[in-house]
Amino acid sequence: MIQKSKIKDLVVFTDENNSKYLNVLNDFLSYNINIIKVFRSIDDTKVMLIDTDYGKLILKVFSPKVKRNERFFKSLLKGDYYERLFEQTQKVRNEGLNTLNDFYLLAERKTLRFVHTYIMIIEYIDGIELCDMPDIDDALKNKIQQSINALHQHGMVSGDPHRGNFIIKNGEVRIIDLSGKRASAQRKAKDRIDLERHYGIKNEIRDLGYYLLVYRKKMRNFMRRLKGKPAR
């Protein structure tokens, strides 16, 4: 069950089994964290590997700087993207699907429903990124396909299943950096098409979502050609 609490000016979401990660958040707010490695550090996004009393964790801080008005209106109409991702992750893992990395804590600093800053504590998976593997054999391709199919069956999508978003640990496939968007038929079809593009895993499901996606791409390319731009 998801628990919601307030720490200073932050609204905090945790799973009832992961309330210990509130201690990690408090350490971060007190500037008392041990940073092992910085993965990303740009104006609006900081992603780092930290060492804690509960092992290594991923800490992500995101403060959106662009399209603020657009994000505000989207949050009013559709709700919050990361809250939805947190809820989906808890639901799917509670249903027994553990291929996706766990999302332990989400903290938000917001006005009304618009979030100015997100703080996320996420499971660190100590394995080999798929992008560091020169060869992907058929057995591994099958595991990748099965992991995405299982994700779809539980109502989630990857959104971007490239090699950097899969980690192999003890011979098993783990998925990271998932999408919090609704698992529509078109988004599932995009995942399958991307698997074929990245890994040569043939898409054998040509449902309505697939044909709508193909049609939209053809229309976008048609409009680009009318404007004198190359097709994508």
Swiss-Prot record:
UniProt EC number: 2.7.1.-
NCBIfam families: PRK10359.1
Entry similarity comment: Belongs to the protein kinase superfamily. RfaY/WaaY family.
GO molecular function, one term: ATP binding
Disruption phenotype: Inactivation of the gene leads to decreased susceptibility to human cathelicidin LL-37, an antimicrobial peptide that acts by damaging bacterial membranes. The decreased susceptibility to LL-37 derives from an altered capacity of the peptide to bind to the bacterial surface and a diminished capacity to lyse membranes. The susceptibility of the mutant to other cationic helical cathelicidins is unaffected.
Protein name: Lipopolysaccharide core heptose(II) kinase WaaY
Catalytic activity annotation: alpha-D-Glc-(1->3)-[L-alpha-D-Hep-(1->7)]-L-alpha-D-Hep-(1->3)-4-O-PO3(2-)-L-alpha-D-Hep-(1->5)-[alpha-Kdo-(2->4)]-alpha-Kdo-(2->6)-lipid A + ATP = alpha-D-Glc-(1->3)-[L-alpha-D-Hep-(1->7)]-4-O-PO3(2-)-L-alpha-D-Hep-(1->3)-4-O-PO3(2-)-L-alpha-D-Hep-(1->5)-[alpha-Kdo-(2->4)]-alpha-Kdo-(2->6)-lipid A + ADP + H(+)
Underlying gene: waaY
